[in-house]
């Protein structure tokens, strides 16, 4: 009898032990599932928060280096009909950064204001230059143009107006934004599936972006002796012939696409910027004056790259820069 009692007790304990292990495993599985399902939520914190509809991670192009995506933020509230769209191209020296820059710092402030003014915003990833890679600056531009072509091709399902496309970028993205604005839609073709898709650029804003690579002295902020070109390797692919350098420099210089019929451009530059010197804004302004092209410049005093203050507070303030940027887009929304 005592033996039966001991065996029964042992059986109960073993059963409870197995049940505990099963419960632990189930709990672990459930926790893993929760963690997996929470990953998108963690990632979502990096996206621009507008309070309105968003279409995130839209695949617009496949490349040998990987798939390319864009994030589309809709106006709040949505106006009737199709929406004008601002293409945002991030900075990072054509070698770093991502479309998530739209949700950071001043860019988040700008784009929240713009979606409230009736614009959609498309923040674009493009291929990045690497020291040992084959991607060059022109690929960054081609990818960004293909993003517009994708939006145009899918304008009906996405609700985007391909005849009201705007551009904005900072630093390297400022150069890309100028290229999007000033070069023709047919130029720099990329994905054959998107080739020939029509669209129309209306206006654009460049924050501290370069306008000309051929004039290398524009990058020499203090006219230093022995100044060396820093961006050549990002324009000319390894293995290129020496005679290919100048045509590629000219091809990637937005100023060469400027005409009297170009869409309006606003360039905002800091007078203490040693990365992309203020010379670029003045040089573009001079060319625009000769052509009677619609280019405006705004010079920020005591401002380095990324509106970093140098020696004193920047003037006008970042708030004024934001307001001027938003007003420029809104002014060119009317009548289009």
Predicted feature residues:
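N-terminal cap/lid segment of alpha/beta-hydrolase-fold proteins
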Residues: 33-81
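Mobile cap/lid helix-loop segments that gate and shape the active-site cleft of serine hydrolases
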Residues: 47, 63, 215-257, 263
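Short beta-strand element of the alpha/beta-hydrolase
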Residues: 81-93
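Catalytic nucleophile-loop/oxyanion-hole region of alpha/beta-hydrolase
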Residues: 102-106, 110-111, 116-117, 122-162, ...
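Primarily recognizes the serine-hydrolase "nucleophile elbow" in alpha/beta-hydrolase
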Residues: 149-220
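Short beta-strand/loop motif that positions the catalytic acidic residue
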Residues: 261, 267-269, 273
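Conserved alpha/beta-hydrolase "acid-adjacent" motif
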Residues: 274-283
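Catalytic active-site module of serine/aspartate enzymes centered on a nucleophile-bearing elbow/loop
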Residues: 314-336
């Amino acid at each position: 009898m005592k033996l039966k009692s001991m065996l029964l007790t042992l059986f109960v304990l073993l059963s409870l032990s197995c049940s505990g292990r099963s419960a632990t495993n189930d709990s672990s599985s459930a926790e893993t599932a929760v963690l997996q399902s929470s990953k998108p939520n963690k990632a979502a914190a990096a996206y621009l928060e507008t309070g309105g509809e968003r279409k995130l991670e839209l695949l617009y192009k496949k490349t040998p280096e990987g798939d390319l995506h864009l994030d589309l933020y809709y106006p709040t509230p949505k106006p009737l009909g199709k929406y004008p769209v601002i293409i945002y191209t991030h900075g990072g020296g054509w070698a770093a950064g991502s479309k998530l820059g739209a949700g950071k710092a001043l860019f988040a402030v700008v784009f929240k204001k713009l979606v409230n003014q009736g614009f959609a915003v498309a923040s674009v990833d493009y291929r990045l230059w690497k020291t040992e890679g084959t991607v060059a600056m022109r690929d960054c531009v081609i990818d960004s143009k293909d993003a517009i072509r994708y939006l145009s091709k899918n304008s009906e399902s996405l609700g985007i107006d391909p005849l009201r496309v705007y551009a904005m970028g900072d630093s390297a993205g400022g150069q890309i934004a100028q290229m999007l604005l000033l070069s023709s839609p047919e130029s720099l073709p990329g994905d054959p599936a998107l080739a020939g898709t029509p669209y129309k650029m209306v206006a654009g804003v460049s924050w501290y972006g370069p306008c000309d690579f051929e004039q290398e002295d524009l990058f020499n902020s203090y006219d230093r002796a022995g100044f060396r070109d820093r961006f050549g390797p990002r324009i000319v692919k390894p293995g290129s012939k020496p005679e290919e350098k100048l045509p590629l420099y000219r091809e990637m210089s937005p100023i060469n696409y400027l005409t009297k019929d170009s869409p309006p451009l606003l360039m905002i530059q800091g007078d203490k910027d040693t990365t992309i010197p203020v010379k670029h804004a003045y040089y573009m302004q001079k060319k625009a004056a000769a052509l009677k092209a619609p280019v405006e410049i705004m010079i920020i005093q005591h401002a380095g790259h990324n509106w970093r203050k140098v020696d004193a507070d920047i003037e006008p303030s970042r708030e004024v820069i934001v307001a001027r940027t938003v007003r420029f887009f809104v002014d060119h929304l009317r009548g289009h």
